[in-house]
Amino acid sequence: MEIKRVGSQASGKGPADWFTGTVRIDPLFQAPDPALVAGASVTFEPGARTAWHTHPLGQTLIVTAGCGWAQREGGAVEEIHPGDVVWFSPGEKHWHGAAPTTAMTHLAIQERLDGKAVDWMEHVTDEQYRR
């Protein structure tokens, strides 16, 4: 058994290459080999969001606070709230973040394939975000 204590892993700022706006990433766990799963708590300030991206084995989001938006390529922007669970299929291009006037926090859980859990793409434009 291994216990990760709260605060044992430093918070980090979401890199500008992958995020628009102010985003804080609090790593929660990365299971040791041979397990592939990792998780983090991610907080988006109002209007902050990820760039478009995919996950080779999919991603689960569990909204814990605030109000957010999520969109898959070709789909509508969906509003998400605490308690909502969002699943993105492997390879599904998507983004997620806070609503324009409200912060949002979610748990993000994904698995690694050949050591990689995410493929980052272009930023979500303001026009795409405001749809």
UniProtKB/Swiss-Prot annotation:
<dbReference type="InterPro" id="IPR011051">
    <property type="entry name" value="RmlC_Cupin_sf"/>
</dbReference>
<dbReference type="Pfam" id="PF07883">
    <property type="entry name" value="Cupin_2"/>
</dbReference>
<comment type="similarity">
    <text>Belongs to the cupin domain-containing hydroxynitrile lyase family.</text>
</comment>
<dbReference type="InterPro" id="IPR014710">
    <property type="entry name" value="RmlC-like_jellyroll"/>
</dbReference>
<protein>
    <recommendedName>
        <fullName>(R)-mandelonitrile lyase</fullName>
        <ecNumber>4.1.2.10</ecNumber>
    </recommendedName>
</protein>
<keyword id="KW-0456">Lyase</keyword>
<dbReference type="GO" id="GO:0016829">
    <property type="term" value="F:lyase activity"/>
</dbReference>
<feature type="binding site">
    <location>
        <position position="94"/>
    </location>
    <ligand>
        <name>Mn(2+)</name>
    </ligand>
</feature>
<feature type="binding site">
    <location>
        <position position="55"/>
    </location>
    <ligand>
        <name>Mn(2+)</name>
    </ligand>
</feature>
<feature type="binding site">
    <location>
        <position position="59"/>
    </location>
    <ligand>
        <name>Mn(2+)</name>
    </ligand>
</feature>
<keyword id="KW-0464">Manganese</keyword>
<dbReference type="InterPro" id="IPR013096">
    <property type="entry name" value="Cupin_2"/>
</dbReference>
<comment type="function">
    <text>Hydroxynitrile lyase which catalyzes mandelonitrile formation from benzaldehyde and hydrogen cyanide with high stereoselectivity in presence of manganese.</text>
</comment>
<dbReference type="GO" id="GO:0046872">
    <property type="term" value="F:metal ion binding"/>
</dbReference>
<dbReference type="InterPro" id="IPR047263">
    <property type="entry name" value="HNL-like_cupin"/>
</dbReference>
<feature type="binding site">
    <location>
        <position position="53"/>
    </location>
    <ligand>
        <name>Mn(2+)</name>
    </ligand>
</feature>
<feature type="domain" description="Cupin type-2">
    <location>
        <begin position="42"/>
        <end position="104"/>
    </location>
</feature>
<keyword id="KW-0479">Metal-binding</keyword>
<feature type="binding site">
    <location>
        <position position="96"/>
    </location>
    <ligand>
        <name>Mn(2+)</name>
    </ligand>
</feature>
